[in-house]
Amino acid sequence: MSGSSPARPSVVVIGGGYAGVNVAKSLDDVADVVLVEPKDAFVHNVAALRALVDPGWLPRIYLPYGGLLSHGRVVQDRAAKVDAGRVVLASGEELPADYLVLATGSSYPFPAKSDVDRTVDAHEKTLGTHAALAAAGRVLLVGAGAVGIELAGEIKAVWPSKQVTLVDVADDVLGGPFRPELKAELRRQLAELGVPVLLGSPLVTAPPTEPGELRTFTVQTQAGTEVTADIWFRCYGVIPVSDYLAGGLAGARGADGHIEVTPTLQVAGQDRVFALGDVSTADRKVAGAAGRQAVVVAGNIRALIEAGSGAAGDAGAAGEAGPAAGAAGLSEYQPAPPGIVVPIGPEGGSGQRAGSEDLLPPEMVAQLK
């Protein structure tokens, strides 16, 4: 019809975490965006451990999706089967897509990440676990990476007299490409708080209770050290969420569950399917990297739209042939040098700034976190 507006391309973003939300918001003005997310609110996971010891933080970390998109919509559902150009939800609804963005992230044991979909249930679980933790005199944290170290600091900041023990099979704290000086500083601060760190020897058997359950038990490391605790938490175990991939996309899923991407963050072998954040092979699994990747993905989809690829009815569905990356002027994601911020309570911790030799002092960690 004369004078009618051209159809806008459809973009389906699967996953409403840091990466997915940023991509969806950035493309809301140029596409019909559908954000698919099983949770009823955005979860600010960075503050989840603080909320466990201080439930007053709960309203700050669960942020409803209402008002996120001006033109698009948020669908509270789970992706059950995703192929290029088509998303089948757990409810049975099917969503066509000119562009697909896979931003489903990863799962991680509670309390670092919520494992329930409704905010009311998440609040109830956190409050119950807080009460159990408050009543415990001795706490075992299995895993001495960033989560275990941070949780130890949060617990000691609120309950200084609690006995908190960290145990890890690794020979040092904070696995990954980080400077020995940073690891030494974190060990020093933990020792200053009276937190024993048992390294280089796994537990003979897992604790006989569920994580977060208040019940006294004793476990032993293979080195022979016994640890008695009243409650424990699992502080390891990142698992990419990608089991929904089907058809031509299934081949992009690696043995470890990560989705293989090109430097432009397109899924290998696909022109209009992108993956980013924890679920992709693009970079380290931190919120900052997800945000930087979102800028690249949103910019590249916008470039493809402006180049004429993918408007509804023009070039078919996601995954079909479109202009080459060079022809559309797509940007490549450049991973940053290793960097991390590890708080130990509200006033402690340290970090490694990307590309810098200097360690972050505790006061800067407090500001950044």
Residue ranges and their predicted role:
Residues 48-54, 114-121, 249-250, 357-358:
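Short glycine-enriched, charge-decorated loop/helix-capping segments at active-site entrances
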Residues 2-10, 70-140, 233:
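FAD-binding core/adjacent interface of flavoenzyme oxidoreductases
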Residues 72-77, 81-82, 87-88, 95, ...:
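A Rossmann-like FAD-binding core segment of flavoenzymes
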Residues 2-73, 150-178, 353:
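Beta1-alpha1 glycine-rich phosphate/pyrophosphate-binding loop at the start
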Residues 19, 105-108, 238-240, 347:
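Short glycine-rich anion-binding loops that position phosphate/pyrophosphate groups of nucleotides
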Residues 284, 293-369:
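C-terminal, flexible cofactor-proximal segment of oxidoreductases
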